[in-house]
């Protein structure tokens, strides 16, 4: 298990999900800064006087002291940095928080470490908490960062067929994850609007912090969502479910 860490170590981590285990314990899935996604046991976490009650709630972010056992990690100590429990009082923020956690659970292998992705993940939670950015733009930006970090990066600047710089296109290759120039055959992909292509290109190369500067219509947001939903569905073994009902309700609002 792991790669070169001591049997007991401290790492920043956020809880992705929990599951009751035996009479008094919990299984906790964490996205950690040092070793990526892991599952750990929190012994006694279900007891009313447990020191782990608050620190084993979904979305809790803190410094976790983990012990590496033969087949499972265990949580020894926790210092909470931010519980992010305020996200639970708003349907939008709880849905997107759950979605970000679900993406990590689906996209990352056990102990697949990526510190840059971890930073973007935690930043996304602070943007959710402060509602300092359009949540759909935040989600699309994080999706693009995740796809890139897990080996499914795009090239919106150069043609994915011939490698020449793209001046203008609205065609995406499903196989090669990128734009196709006007000189190359357009097969095995699909057309999108020029506006949606521009949004994808901007969000892909910008930082999470700067994504808020772009203004996007609801129509283009919906188009970009469908594009990335398709790529996420084909890239990973499971399709995330957290946004499906939520987006159905949102689309109903737009159409009223």
From Swiss-Prot:
Pfam families: RecO_C, RecO_N. The keyword Acyltransferase does not apply. One of its GO terms (cellular component) is bacterial nucleoid. Keywords: DNA damage, DNA recombination, DNA repair. SUPFAM superfamilies: ArfGap/RecO-like zinc finger (SSF57863), Nucleic acid-binding proteins (SSF50249). Belongs to the RecO family. Involved in DNA repair and RecF pathway recombination. This is DNA repair protein RecO. It comes from Clostridium novyi (strain NT). The gene is recO.
């Amino acid at each position: 298990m792991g790669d070169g860490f001591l049997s007991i170590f401290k790492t920043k981590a956020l809880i992705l999900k929990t599951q009751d285990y035996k009479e008094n314990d919990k299984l906790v899935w964490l996205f950690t800064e040092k070793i990526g996604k892991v599952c750990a046991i929190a012994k006694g976490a279900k007891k009313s006087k447990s020191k782990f009650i608050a620190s084993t709630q979904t979305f809790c972010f803190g410094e976790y002291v983990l012990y590496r056992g033969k087949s499972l990690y265990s949580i020894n100590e926790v210092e909470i940095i931010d519980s992010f429990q305020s996200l639970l009082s708003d349907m939008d923020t709880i849905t997107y928080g759950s979605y970000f956690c679900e993406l990590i659970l689906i996209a990352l292998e056990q102990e697949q470490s990526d510190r840059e992705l971890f930073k973007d993940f935690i930043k996304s939670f602070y943007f959710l908490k402060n509602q300092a950015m359009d949540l759909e733009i935040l989600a699309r930006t994080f999706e693009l960062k995740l796809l890139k970090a897990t080996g499914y990066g795009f090239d919106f600047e150069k043609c994915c067929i011939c490698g020449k710089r793209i001046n203008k296109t609205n065609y995406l290759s499903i196989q090669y994850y990128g734009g196709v120039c006007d000189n190359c055959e357009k097969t095995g992909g699909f057309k999108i609007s020029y506006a949606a292509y521009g949004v994808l290109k901007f969000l892909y190369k910008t930082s999470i912090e700067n994504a808020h500067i772009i203004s996007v219509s609801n129509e283009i947001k919906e188009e970009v969502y469908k594009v990335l939903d398709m790529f996420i569905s084909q890239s990973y073994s499971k399709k995330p479910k957290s946004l499906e009902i939520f987006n159905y309700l949102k689309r109903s609002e737009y159409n009223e």
